[in-house]
Structures are given as structure tokens and as C-alpha cells.
Amino acid sequence: MNATLGYANQKVVSAIMAQLEKLMTYDMVEGGNAPAIELARAIAQVTAPGLTRTFFCNSGSEGIETAIKVSRRYHKLLNDSQRSLIVSLKNCYHGTTLAASTCATSSASDEQGLLPAGFVSVPGPDWEAVRREGLAVSHSGIEALEVFFAEHGENISAFIVEPVQGIGGYIVPDNYLRAARALCTQYGAHLILDEVLTGFGRTGKMFAYEYAHITPDLLITSKGLTAGYMSLAAVTTHDKIFDVFEREKEMSGFSHGHTHSGHASACAAGLAVLDILQNDGVLGRVQQLSTVLREAVGACAETATVREIRCRGLLMAVEFDSVQRALSIKKHLQDNKILIRRSGRNIIFAPPLNIDLADIEYLATQFLDAVRVASAQ
């Protein structure tokens, strides 16, 4: 999932090496470095209008922690400190650090008292209804979020959601995201989009939120930002959030940071990746290869052991009737030197965005063979 431009991409490697030979990095707390500044500007050029201010950290989990801190602090600066609730969807995944992991479990279910307070998970999309109604029109399941906002809206700091859930590869319907955006606006809460997995081309668009034609208040990206070559994450905020922090003179901006935040060599990698995505026709090719992959793998759709195939760009999930079936398919592919991800009873495809057509066809052929073998067991 990380190697979005494959291995040993010379444009990215050369950019990293060139930066290492000049200055590996420089502290961002009281200073800065040119690659970080340039990358922040470059991100502002490809995100939705208003998303112009970026804070760099080192991983998706750190990005989640940062976004939560920004959201809560924003409301406190506006003397709205009762807004502390962070709302997420059940069965989500946002990372393994303290607040990030609590998003997936909620404070209420913490019987041992180990997790921080103020986190609530609500039921998400009704996936069975989404299957029946179709991804393009469904917003089934939004009722649970509407009820929670109606009951607790004045206490909600932010709602955080992945446009495509990393666990299982479930695509959150565009209408659901639009309704969530409207709820956040209506009740004065922030919409935080976790695009750690989907950001920078994975779905065939630069960002997955483009499918729903919405703009988040905070956007978190990581994996595709450097294509896995260096550890880097970005929290990009809307101007309206930045302006509140800038007006608070005693804060001197956003008081937050890590030793390697905005690492210059990592940001150099990010600049090279963005250049490739924008100038080498990658996104258009992802759309074309997505069609090929979906049609090829779709040959197993009528197999009795296959429950559903979900695909957006070069991110595909094939759901089987059991975890054991998925394990068997993964082992068969590994035995044939194909590395693939399994999540529960789902097999997840996330090949490099610049993969060759021949490799896509080979991957699909080997997968169909694995399905035939596993289905006969």
C-alpha cells in the first residue's frame, strides 16, 4: 500500500540523495527548511480551495493525533471548550497511538480505564443496503450519525472518517460523506478526513474526497505522500482554522511538534512524488488500469465463495465467505511470489500506481487461479 510508485524509483531516490548531500533536515519548531516550505505550497496547489495550511509529522497515527489536538484547541480558542467529543465510525481504523486507537474503540467501551475520554464511535454505513442500492446513490446508515449529532451536537469537536476504510476496503458512499459534511457544518463541528491510505492518487483522483465533491476542514495524508520512500505525514487545514490560531497571539501559532516534523529529506521525496503524479500522467493511467483490474478480477464475481468486489481506482477488495478462504488464497498467492494484503475475509489489492498492464493481467490471472483452488476446498 505504501509503495505507490514501486521500488527504486530513480526520480524519488535522486531527490532524497540530493537533499541529504545538502542538509538532511532542520528543526521546524523555531526555524524551517526549504523542502518543507515548498511541499506545503505544493500541497496547497492540489487540494480543494481553502485547504492551504499544512503541518508535517511522521506517520498517519501522528497525523490523527495532531488533527484531534487542532480541532479541540480551535474550539477552546473560541471559548467553546465544551466541544471535545471526537466522533468516529465503528469498525474503523485510524492508527495505533493513544487517541488514534481510541477513535476505533470509543472511550465508553474502555473497561480498564486505559483510553482518553471524549471519543465516541457510532454505526457507519449500512453495507448490506449499500450493496442493494448501489454505491452511487446510497446514503444508508447516515441516520445513526444524524441522531448522535441531534443529541450531542453542541459537544462535538469533530467527526473523523476514512473515505475508503482500510479494514476491509469498504467504500463510504459519496452521499454519506456529503451528508456528514452537511451535519458538521450545521452543528459547527469539524470534518476530519483520514486519507492516509487514499491520498495522492490511490483512488484515481488526487484525493478520495473529490468523488463526493466535498471539502474537509482537516485532511490527513501519509502513505502516498512520499510513496513509502521516507516517513512523512501531512495535516492540511482549512484557512478558517489557521486564522483562529494566528489571531491568538499568546499561542504564537500552533504549539506542537516532533523531533523530525517536516524532515527536509522526506519533504524532498514528497516534492518528487507530487511532480510525478502531476506530470507523468499517473492519475489517468490509474483510472485505465482500474477498469482492467476490475474487469479481470470480476470474472470470479459469480463464484459461490465470493460475496462482493469493491473497487475505487487501484484499491480493490474481494470479500469471501470466510476468513479461512481468504487465508488460503493469500497463501496460494504468496507461494507464487505475489505479496497481497488480507483483512478478515477480504483480499485487498493495492498495487503501485505505475504498475505495467502486463503485471496487472498476471496478478489477476494468479488471483483467479487461487480462487479456483480455494473454492474447491
Regions found by a protein language model. Name each.
Residues 1-377:
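Conserved N-terminal phosphate-binding loop of PLP-dependent enzymes in the Aspartate aminotransferase
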